[in-house]
């Protein structure tokens, strides 16, 4: 009887991370409120396009890379340089746990993405952006989303 009670209690304590996949327009509104539109010269369309090609708007996206590092969250931010997972050698330049980049609250992910754009070569950090968004008309990405 005690074992059943303990198991029930443990079941309540386990946190399950449910994948959150945003819509294009919901992200446009979140990104707009976070002042990403024209941040460092990159339009809102750049951010929406990049997030689509990096994670398909999935906050819990993870990609294991050949070098042993992992890309996390909606922006696919790398553990080797930008966030802390479990490895001690990581630089953690965003001063954030990688798990914080995979929540429905995009605050930490947006702050870190801004830091990446500011401290590196803009949005060139993201291969999805370079291949699919750079130099293109991105006005369609926010069309119909009720953002300016």
Swiss-Prot record:
This protein's major location comes to: secreted
Name which cysteines form disulfide bonds. Answer: 25-145, 49-133, 83-98, 94-112
Q: Which residues form the C-type lysozyme domain?
A: 20-148
Catalytic site positions: 54, 71
Question: Which keywords appear in this protein's UniProt record, sorted alphabetically?
Answer: Disulfide bond, Glycoprotein, Glycosidase, Hydrolase, Secreted, Signal
Signal peptide positions are: 1-19
EC number(s) stated in the UniProt entry for this protein? 3.2.1.17
Compartment annotation: Secreted
InterPro entries of this UniProt entry?
Answer: Glyco_hydro_22, Glyco_hydro_22_CS, Glyco_hydro_22_lys, Lysozyme-like_dom_sf
The GO terms this record gives for MF are: lysozyme activity
Gene Ontology, cellular component aspect: extracellular region
Q: Which reaction does it catalyse?
A: Hydrolysis of (1->4)-beta-linkages between N-acetylmuramic acid and N-acetyl-D-glucosamine residues in a peptidoglycan and between N-acetyl-D-glucosamine residues in chitodextrins
Q: Which SMART domains match?
A: LYZ1 (SM00263)
Write down a Pfam family by its short name: Lys
User: Where do the record's glycosylation annotations fall on this chain?
Assistant: 58
Under PROSITE patterns, the record lists: GLYCOSYL_HYDROL_F22_1, GLYCOSYL_HYDROL_F22_2
- Family membership noted in the UniProt record: Belongs to the glycosyl hydrolase 22 family.
Q: What does the subunit section of this Swiss-Prot or TrEMBL entry state?
A: Monomer.
> Which protein is depicted?
Lysozyme-like protein 1
Instruction: Identify the gene encoding this protein.
Output: LYZL1
